Amino acid sequence: KLGFRCDFGSTSFASVRRAIMLTINRNEFAQTFTGGYGSVVHGPYYEGSAAYKAVKDTIKLNAYTYSVQSAIDELVDGGWIYNEKGEKFDAAKDTVRYKKLSGYELSSDNLKFKSTDGKYSVIKLDGEYYMPLVVNWYGTQPNDVTNQLVTAWQTAKAAKDIGMYITYTSTEFNPGIYGELYRMEENGYDGTPKLNAINFATGFNSAVYDFAFSWTLNQNLYNDYNSAHLMDEADFYEKYTK
């Protein structure tokens, strides 16, 4: 799966996460990766599981059907409508979209957000801060999924068409997951948040389908168990520092 760190940077915005999924052709990806023997599911389950069978006739899941235009619509609705000059984004001449930050979005981590190659960063224009549509992706290696994501997502035309810039950093499992995603210094984290996305697997290691720990907001459990570091606005605002 492609997982996101959702408490800073571009991937803290749901519009960006949805746009990413709309510009990855998931059916094509699954067919290519499995040699035609795989199929797409829309969450951490498999169709033979009891949890899925119990709700398969009533559950409604977003299939994120591949659509560049739908991705653009998500970004526009989410406020990614500016260029690096603070003017209206023009796809004919501008490369990367920007979003004007306000309120709790003006966190310390957000204001320092930049691409890992240093090409793009948050800019200040006339007292306003604008964030670039940059996604810093870490890909574990050796990993065939990582290799396929490079062509199916990072360097794909669709990413450029929506005004998104994606950096790729090759990483081993421990430095990527525990160092950059979970920010553990003993695994190489240097104190500066960088990672927005990383690909890794979902394991089915329990007969009980319970993902409560994966989305906990309990501050005693959050850092170790919340897989996406996804807070609601109230939680984020408590940590707000300008």
Listing of model-derived features with the role each one plays in the protein:
Residues K1, R18, V134-N136, Y165-T167, ...:
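Beta-sheet entry/capping signal
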Residues K1-D7, N27, Q31-G36, V40, ...:
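Extracellular/periplasmic solute-recognition and catalytic clefts
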Residues A30, I166-I177, Y209-K242:
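Extracytoplasmic/peripheral linker and loop segments enriched in polar/acidic and small residues
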Residues Y130-N136, A156-I177:
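A local structural motif
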